[in-house]
Amino acid sequence: MLNAGVLTFQEFAMRETLLLSTIHESVLEFLQGRDDVVLFGAQAVNAYVSEPRMTQDIDLLSTDAKNLAEELKSFLSEKFHIAVRIREIRDKGLRIYQVRNEGNRHLIDIRSIIGFPDIEIIEEIQILSPLELIVSKVISFQSRYGKPKSWTDRRDLAVLLLRFPELKEKVAENLHSKNVGDAVLETWAEIARQDFQLEETDEDLSF
């Protein structure tokens, strides 16, 4: 499953006519068959695990980030008749957002990259491989440590490691090859010691 397709309570309360999940579905369809972009982040996690989670934005890696951003801007604007803008975030990439009176809506982040790491192709979409996705989540978790989004990174790591336990021993080697700092390696060592377990079907009622 790629798109969680979830209605948020705020969308319900505001009687939102254009749901974020609808935009995400269209973006994923736009990505099909392209070789200049790779999906990562939460929607990539959703591609590999059975229990999806909602995310505000779609995260992309591209070898032609600026042109891709312009294409996506035009595509979304024409398809949904909405005001779409691109903002460059220095040293990080490009952000595509919807301009709205009630507050702008963050839709897509695109990071520029020279060459792609290992990928898988699912539903005709290039997606970061499970190992590379786990590694990216470790780096993200450490960089956002203590902030709310770090806990979504940790959740993503847990479900990915449960889905691909055989990759656990390969993560440290991959991190070393990327010359990450000691803080990231220490974070991974702490995560690797965790004994993640699958939840029983009815455990979500235990509160």
Give the residues covered by each predicted segment.
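Compositionally biased terminal segments of proteins
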Residues: 1-207
